[in-house]
Amino acid sequence: MAKRDYYEVLGVNRDASDNEIKKAYRKLAMKHHPDRNPDNKDSEDHFKEAKNAYEILSDAQKRAAYDRYGHAGVDPSAGAGPGGQGFDGFADAFSDIFGDIFGGAGGAGRGRSNVYRGADLRYNLEISLEEAARGADKTIRIPTVEECETCHGSGAKPGTQPKPCPTCGGAGQVRIQQGFFSIQQTCPKCHGTGRIIPDPCRDCGGAGRVKRQKTLEVKIPAGIDEGMRLRHAGHGEPGVNGGPPGDLYVEIHIRAHPVFQRDHDDLHCEMPISITTAALGGEIEIPTLEGMARLKIPAETQSGKVFRLRGKGIRNVRSQAHGDLMCHVVVETPVNLTERQKELLREFEEVSSSDADRHNPKAKSWMDKVKDFFGA
């Protein structure tokens, strides 16, 4: 499984200060510490992941290498490119062995250009329910890194050039002898680039890249739901040594709506009606995303009744089908009554008491169940 971005692991921005990184790590460490979560494998994995991220981002040199090269700049096992060593690294090790024994060229990885794909970026975008339903065009500004215009990405002061790394001779990897085995690892001095920069560029500090704010237009498709991600290929961080750029993933979050609650393509809303309308029936106005609509309420409607308005929900993001609007009836008990209103209600109670079972069937059914329960 590919490693997660260390900034994402700690939940901080790429331009976070050392103090912000430390606070984020402490919070995660306390939450997932093994002493607090015994026998919890997920918490143990989260704890280790946060610890690894903090070890890199809390060290200025390692952080600079990570910002420039991603995991490949700080993890020797990533020297074979994104995703770690994999089968190719295994084959390289045996190639080195047979090369040493038989005097062959060996080291299939020697002289590699150390080209790396740029890191992916993630942006959380909050939109309204109406925008999610109808679609929208949004403009976002994302923090990213771009090639330094002063040194054109070389990292060296104008008029100077990077030099071959004296440790690896420019190969980007070093050979380590372990008994009969000869293996290769990413050079710890140049972090796999095969070069060092004696006179760093003043504008980028030798990184070859600088932090920037990038403006991007994002098209939100109609019907998009909470947590869905929009991929913008090539809008991540630039690659290293001519490698392809990463991608930008825009994750959608929908603000809570004062009237509607969403359930996939369906919408739900509460519909308060008066006792009179519930008892006698009537016609009321209800809100939809397209405007107000009229709904007939039949007589003797009870609280909790659900009316379905077909096609008044949200269009499915992958088809033209629409969800429904579910209106949940809430019969309101009148408040702040005048004396005359109270008198009329008491009068209604008196004239209804002689035939209460017929007028209140649910109450009778409930009382019958209570009597059966107590054996009355």
Swiss-Prot record:
Highest taxon above the source species: Bacteria
GO cellular component, one term: cytoplasm
Cofactor: Zn(2+)
SMART domains: DnaJ
One MF term in the entry's GO annotations: unfolded protein binding
Location of this chain's protein in the cell: Cytoplasm
GO biological process entries: chaperone cofactor-dependent protein refolding; DNA replication; protein refolding; response to heat
Domain J: 5-70
UniProt CXXCXGXG motif repeat ranges: 148-155, 165-172, 187-194, 201-208
Entry-linked Pfam families: DnaJ, DnaJ_C, DnaJ_CXXCXGXG
Annotated keywords: Chaperone, Cytoplasm, DNA replication, Metal-binding, Repeat, Stress response, Zinc, Zinc-finger
Principal location class: cytoplasm
Zinc finger annotations (CR-type) as residue ranges: 135-213
UniProt keyword Metal-binding, yes or no: yes
Residues annotated as binding Zn(2+) 1: C148, C151, C201, C204
Family affiliation: Belongs to the DnaJ family.
Domain notes: The J domain is necessary and sufficient to stimulate DnaK ATPase activity. Zinc center 1 plays an important role in the autonomous, DnaK-independent chaperone activity of DnaJ. Zinc center 2 is essential for interaction with DnaK and for DnaJ activity.
Function: Participates actively in the response to hyperosmotic and heat shock by preventing the aggregation of stress-denatured proteins and by disaggregating proteins, also in an autonomous, DnaK-independent fashion. Unfolded proteins bind initially to DnaJ; upon interaction with the DnaJ-bound protein, DnaK hydrolyzes its bound ATP, resulting in the formation of a stable complex. GrpE releases ADP from DnaK; ATP binding to DnaK triggers the release of the substrate protein, thus completing the reaction cycle.
Subunit and partners: Homodimer.
Stated name of the protein: Chaperone protein DnaJ 2
Originating species: Aromatoleum aromaticum (strain DSM 19018 / LMG 30748 / EbN1) (Azoarcus sp. (strain EbN1))
Gene: dnaJ2
